[in-house]
Amino acid sequence: MAEGGVPLEKTAIGTYVPPAKPSLIGLSRAEMAERLAAIGIPREQRRMRVQQLWHWMYVRGARTFAEMTSVSKDMRAELEKHVTLDRPEVVAEQISSDGTRKWLLRLPSGDDLEKPHEVECVYIPETDRGTLCVSSQVGCTLNCSFCHTGTQRLVRNLTAGEIVGQIMVARDRLNDWADRETPHGNRLVTNIVMMGMGEPLYNFDAVRDGLLIVADNEGIGISKRRITLSTSGVVPNIVRAGEEIGVMLAISLHAVRDELRDELVPLNRKYPIAELMQACRDYPAASNAKRITFEYVMLKGVNDSLDDARRLVKLLNGIHAKINLIPFNPWPGTRYECSDWDQIEKFSEYVFNAGYSSPVRTPRGRDILAACGQLKSETEKLSARERQALRAMAMTD
């Protein structure tokens, strides 16, 4: 049981039921060696075989064992009998006018009678980087009032393999794997943000295990300084994340008064602002070079006054911090509006003059509901025929 009140491997709603023939994706080296032992690979070969598999899976992006030409034919046949390299299935892809891509990914439900479980993953290309926004849960339990994902019930946690699988799907779709022509070439996916569907720190073990695989420099190899974990404030797991994962930290703050944050981010009722700020001060990976990002969505007439800006500066005193100001991205049925641009600039200027970096995030992918706070698995509501139509669309891409 997580200290925040939600089990780490089993949610209050549903559980993950592994397939009869499991995927190797998401296993640590030790777990992969155990899997090889279970299918009869001799002890003296396991370390070498794990290294071979790791390279083919996470450097070359192999989708089948047949591609692994440095592995013996007999070994490939044995692997094919017992395990897979399956990643999430792309159900649909949308491409924004600004180049942002959103993938709807299908996951095993664990029950043939259930609708397939689906999450969304977003790729945001920029001139100097390519950022992938990754989900940690199917749905969300936090019910943040301004967030579209919060209107979808929590279904279950993702596994480490499903988290790593999102990065692999993105590299598949973008043709972003190393090959003979580009063994060390620039990659399109350079940064990872755990800012998709779900609260990462309510799925701590899977998020930790997945991100450590993503950061492994003998595989996918994305530096921990290019990976950001965003939390709404699961205080007991914040310091633990710094100790066991060591990536960059972002806090979904959005308010500087408990009474307002209780409404915007209901988790605040359990872990109020003072406790959250202390956890940030204690975060072991924070420094002037590795500042904590505080995300602050700009809501017209709600949290965007200069008094709010003054309180924010006072609140962050003594924390290595930067502030991301996020223009609110509307979604169907919301009661909030985005702050006027003039007010956003005044807020940003006040925070900047107080000594904090305060960039205003450029909205990306709004036209395909891929921007911050807009993600939701709309197919949770679709009929089987409609889901089949979406899958057919994806296969023709």
Swiss-Prot record:
User: What organism, scientifically named, is this protein from?
Assistant: Nitrobacter winogradskyi (strain ATCC 25391 / DSM 10237 / CIP 104748 / NCIMB 11846 / Nb-255)
- Cofactor remark from the record: Binds 1 [4Fe-4S] cluster. The cluster is coordinated with 3 cysteines and an exchangeable S-adenosyl-L-methionine.
Which intervals hold domain Radical SAM core?
Answer: 126-369
Entry cofactors: [4Fe-4S] cluster
Q: Name one GO biological process term.
A: rRNA base methylation
**InterPro entries linked:** Aldolase_TIM, Elp3/MiaA/NifB-like_rSAM, Methyltransferase_A, RlmN_N, RNA_MTrfase_RlmN, rRNA_lsu_MTrfase_RlmN/Cfr, rSAM
Q: By its UniProt entry, which HAMAP family does this protein fall under? A: RNA_methyltr_RlmN (MF_01849)
Active site positions, chain numbering: 120, 372
Entry GO CC: cytoplasm
Family per record: Belongs to the radical SAM superfamily. RlmN family.
> Looking at the record's lineage, which domain of life comes first?
Bacteria
Q: Which UniProt keywords apply?
A: 4Fe-4S, Cytoplasm, Disulfide bond, Iron, Iron-sulfur, Metal-binding, Methyltransferase, rRNA processing, S-adenosyl-L-methionine, Transferase, tRNA processing
Give the EC number(s) listed in the UniProt record. 2.1.1.192
- The name this protein carries in UniProt is Dual-specificity RNA methyltransferase RlmN
Which Gene3D superfamilies is this protein grouped with?
Answer: 1.10.150.530, Aldolase class I (3.20.20.70)
Q: Quick one: which gene encodes this?
A: rlmN
Offer an example of a GO molecular function term for this protein. Answer: 4 iron, 4 sulfur cluster binding
